């Protein structure tokens, strides 16, 4: 059993998600101690519990200590079963963070898996569903991940109520070299249970700033009913994306400009993937090998690298230049 210090680095929930995902995939039991030790509310939060329970169900794992507020758990995985599963995170817990946790493990399932996840689709401190679909998954496909994803209903803070469906097939992971893709900018601006002009103003402000900086873009408008009112915008070009969420007291124009500015920062760097995707791809480059560049190495990325190296006994290197190059020969 491998022991993981959950307080290492940024000491957040990502250590838990990555550890349990790689444990499930490899069959290696893990003990995680000091979970979120330095956070205002230490221990497992509800969405971490749901993620561990979901992987335990899919892999018929034995678990110890998996409950709200727990600072130490053990996870002893079994075989990863095919089938259909439902996971309700509750309120507006992030569906994309849970899928990030499930996806590496599901590549090694015995057969096709379909997971329906209910919770928050566009919430703070996590990728949006549009980012997952249009930026992260296409990059993961290059590593051999065979998965499709659709959002059936958006869910905003605080009630959530979003519904997404992830379908996977057994995948043979392979090394991938992610090159810079220079292509047009696309986007989706959306609002739920709010007037359509909210989404349109977000899009118009983003388009204006992008045009001012010399970029053309196409942004689709989506409106729908939702359990809680909310809005957001996601922009992308190749493997670089950005997003911003509306909130009470913030003008729609400011939301649009926030997303546009973040994407412009990524495009100017000439790196092949954005800062957040660099973090999300660590399990795949650790398993299969490959390389990509990013403009910055976040604390999340460094912590994820440390976690993957602890479990997989692989080596992931970072070369610093005008951009950072992350590369690995994998764990095979």
Swiss-Prot record:
Coiled-coil positions: none
Keywords: ATP-binding, Cytoplasm, Ligase, Nucleotide-binding
BP GO terms, sorted: RNA processing
Catalytic activity of the protein: a 3'-end 3'-phospho-ribonucleotide-RNA + ATP = a 3'-end 2',3'-cyclophospho-ribonucleotide-RNA + AMP + diphosphate
Enzyme class: ligase
Chain positions recorded as ATP binding sites: 100, 276-280
Annotated EC: 6.5.1.4
HAMAP family noted in UniProt: RTC
Subcellular location: Cytoplasm
Species of the source: Methanothrix thermoacetophila (strain DSM 6194 / JCM 14653 / NBRC 101360 / PT)
Cellular-component GO terms for this entry: cytoplasm
Residues at the active site: 300 (tele-amp-histidine intermediate)
Cystine bridges: none
A GO molecular-function annotation: RNA-3'-phosphate cyclase activity
Pfam families associated with the record: RTC, RTC_insert
Family, per entry: Belongs to the RNA 3'-terminal cyclase family. Type 1 subfamily.
Record protein name field: RNA 3'-terminal phosphate cyclase
Described function: Catalyzes the conversion of 3'-phosphate to a 2',3'-cyclic phosphodiester at the end of RNA. The mechanism of action of the enzyme occurs in 3 steps: (A) adenylation of the enzyme by ATP; (B) transfer of adenylate to an RNA-N3'P to produce RNA-N3'PP5'A; (C) and attack of the adjacent 2'-hydroxyl on the 3'-phosphorus in the diester linkage to produce the cyclic end product. The biological role of this enzyme is unknown but it is likely to function in some aspects of cellular RNA processing.
């Amino acid at each position: 059993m491998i022991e993981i210090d959950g307080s290492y680095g940024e000491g957040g929930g990502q250590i838990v998600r990555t550890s349990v995902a790689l444990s499930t995939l490899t069959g290696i039991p893990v003990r995680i101690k000091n979970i979120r030790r330095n956070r205002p509310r230490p221990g497992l939060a509800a969405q971490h519990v749901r993620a561990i329970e979901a992987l335990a169900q899919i892999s018929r794992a034995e678990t110890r200590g998996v409950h709200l507020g727990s600072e130490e758990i053990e996870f002893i995985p079994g075989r990863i079963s095919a089938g259909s599963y439902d996971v309700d995170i509750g309120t507006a817990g992030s569906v994309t963070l849970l899928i990030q946790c499930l996806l590496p493990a599901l590549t090694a399932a015995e057969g096709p898996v379909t997971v329906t996840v209910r919770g928050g689709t566009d919430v703070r401190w996590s990728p949006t569903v549009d980012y997952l679909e249009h930026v992260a998954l296409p990059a993961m496909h290059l590593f051999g991940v065979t998965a499709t994803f659709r959002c059936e209903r958006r869910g905003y803070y605080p009630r959530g109520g979003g519904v997404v469906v992830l379908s996977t097939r057994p995948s043979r992971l392979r090394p991938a070299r992610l090159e810079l893709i220079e292509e047009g900018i696309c986007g989706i601006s959306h609002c739920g249970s709010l007037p359509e002009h909210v989404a349109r103003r977000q899009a118009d402000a983003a388009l204006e700033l992008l045009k001012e900086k010399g970029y053309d873009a196409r942004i689709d408008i989506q409106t729908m009913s939702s359990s809680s009112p909310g809005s957001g915008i996601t922009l992308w070009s190749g493997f670089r994306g950005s997003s911003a969420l509306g909130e009470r007291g913030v003008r729609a124009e400011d939301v649009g400009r926030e997303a546009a500015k973040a994407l412009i920062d990524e495009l100017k760097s000439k790196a092949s993937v954005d800062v957040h995707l660099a973090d999300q791809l660590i399990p795949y480059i650790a398993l299969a090998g490959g390389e990509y560049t990013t403009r910055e190495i976040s604390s999340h990325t460094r912590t994820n690298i440390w976690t993957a190296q602890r479990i997989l006994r692989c080596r992931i290197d970072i070369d610093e230049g005008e951009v950072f190059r992350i590369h690995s020969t994998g764990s095979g």
